[in-house]
């Protein structure tokens, strides 16, 4: 590996594409006749295929979880702090697979892909997806790679929901579930945040009912506002106060409604601008709906313990003290249900000032707890 990369990096990685021509039936009643999933792998699959770990991404995530696509990249993959030699998901031990989910906008088939039936981008005609749909598609990817059972399925936030769903839908295919900063279903407040974000996009004049690509435009304003709202919920009050306080961009107030006066305003606008230039509006709508619809215990009348009665995986559940988007109380709901179902579970509640985004930040106790659990997994 080139010396330009840190010694604990997986180094240069090349995305790969898997095409599936067998129709995929979806929860909404529709199906996809064919689709593609973009993914990356890190480490080496052992002879018995017993060391495979699946990484499931959150709302705005993608397949590029670790390493670099070029020596000139300024930043590595989004979870590089946790994936690599000697890191919690140690690529000296594990073969790691990270994908861009169906409906995404980073290469996998999604709303911005060409609909073979029309020759135009799917746009708003792309079917609504659920977490369970994603898991079904991920099963096929695993089989394509020769993996019948995952040593672990790992994810944070929406990724944690996928990890939990894996153990319910395919209990025989998962030995360990690492579910971080997640919840067994969304609260009314979380659904409300998602609806505000969707309305920002849907009411943008440039959205054109989801057919904005046909018009050669992007609903930039709506995406920007959606990201600004979402980003506030990913941070804690303390971390925002420490980072920005009431600091001004200049040394005076302008007494108008158009200037960017506070540092926190500047930060949110930057985050919104950056996001609106790289993310697809229809994908954002799909991802938030998948979050809203996630409720694996619904079929059991809301009884999560009964839903988990048949699972066989061991679980590691982690939460962060200042995460108010998916608070520790939501993780403890999962832990309590697993204990009621007499399943093996360990729980780590980590003191962190970083809010929901803490699952992306390599604080010492988080890294130690994560490593300790992963190192216990027999391969």
From Swiss-Prot:
One of its GO terms (biological process) is methionine biosynthetic process. It catalyses: L-homoserine + succinyl-CoA = O-succinyl-L-homoserine + CoA. Its main location: cytoplasm. Pfam families: Abhydrolase_1. GO terms for molecular function: homoserine O-acetyltransferase activity; homoserine O-succinyltransferase activity. It is found in: Cytoplasm. Residues 51-360 form the AB hydrolase-1 domain. The record marks 325 as: Important for acyl-CoA specificity. Pathway: Amino-acid biosynthesis; L-methionine biosynthesis via de novo pathway; O-succinyl-L-homoserine from L-homoserine: step 1/1. Substrate binds at residues 227, 357. GO terms for cellular component: cytoplasm. InterPro entries: AB_hydrolase_1, AB_hydrolase_fold, HAT_MetX-like. The active site is at residues 157, 323, 356. It comes from the Bacteria. Keywords: Acyltransferase, Amino-acid biosynthesis, Cytoplasm, Methionine biosynthesis, Transferase. Its EC number is 2.3.1.46. Belongs to the AB hydrolase superfamily. MetX family. Homodimer. Transfers a succinyl group from succinyl-CoA to L-homoserine, forming succinyl-L-homoserine. PANTHER family: HOMOSERINE O-ACETYLTRANSFERASE. This is Homoserine O-succinyltransferase. It comes from Pseudomonas putida (strain GB-1). The gene is metXS.
């Amino acid at each position: 590996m080139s010396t330009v990369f840190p010694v604990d990096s997986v180094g240069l990685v090349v995305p790969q594409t898997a095409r599936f021509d067998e129709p995929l039936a979806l929860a909404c009643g529709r199906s996809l006749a064919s689709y593609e999933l973009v993914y990356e792998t890190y480490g080496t699959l052992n002879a018995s295929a017993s060391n495979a770990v699946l990484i499931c991404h959150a709302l705005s995530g993608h397949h590029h979880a670790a390493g670099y696509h070029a020596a000139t990249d300024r930043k590595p993959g989004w979870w590089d702090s946790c994936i690599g030699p000697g890191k919690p998901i140690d690529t000296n031990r594990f073969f790691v697979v990270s994908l861009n989910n169906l409906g995404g906008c980073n290469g996998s088939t999604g709303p911005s892909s060409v609909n073979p039936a029309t020759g135009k981008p799917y746009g708003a005609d792309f079917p609504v997806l659920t977490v369970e749909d994603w898991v079904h598609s991920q099963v096929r990817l695993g089989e394509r790679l020769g993996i019948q059972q995952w040593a672990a399925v790992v994810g944070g936030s929406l990724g944690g929901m996928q990890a939990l769903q894996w153990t319910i839908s395919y209990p025989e295919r998962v030995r360990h579930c690492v579910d971080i900063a997640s919840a067994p279903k969304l609260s009314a407040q979380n659904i409300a945040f998602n609806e505000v974000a969707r309305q920002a996009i849907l009411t943008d004049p440039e959205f054109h009912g989801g057919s904005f690509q046909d018009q050669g435009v992007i609903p930039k304003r709506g995406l920007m506002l959606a990201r600004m709202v979402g980003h506030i919920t990913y941070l804690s009050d303390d971390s925002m106060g420490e980072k920005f306080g009431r600091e001004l961009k200049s040394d005076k107030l302008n007494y108008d409604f158009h200037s960017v006066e506070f540092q926190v305003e500047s930060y949110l606008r930057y985050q919104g601008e950056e996001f609106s230039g790289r993310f697809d509006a229809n994908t954002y709508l799909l991802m938030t709906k998948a979050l809203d619809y996630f409720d694996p215990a619904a079929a059991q009348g809301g009884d999560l313990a009964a839903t988990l009665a048949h699972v066989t995986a061991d679980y590691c559940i982690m939460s962060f003290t200042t995460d108010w988007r998916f608070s520790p109380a939501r993780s403890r709901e999962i832990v309590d249900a697993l204990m009621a179902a007499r399943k093996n579970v360990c729980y780590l509640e980590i003191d962190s000032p970083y809010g929901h985004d803490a699952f992306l930040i390599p604080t010492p106790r988080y890294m130690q707890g994560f490593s300790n659990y992963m190192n216990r997994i027999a391969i």
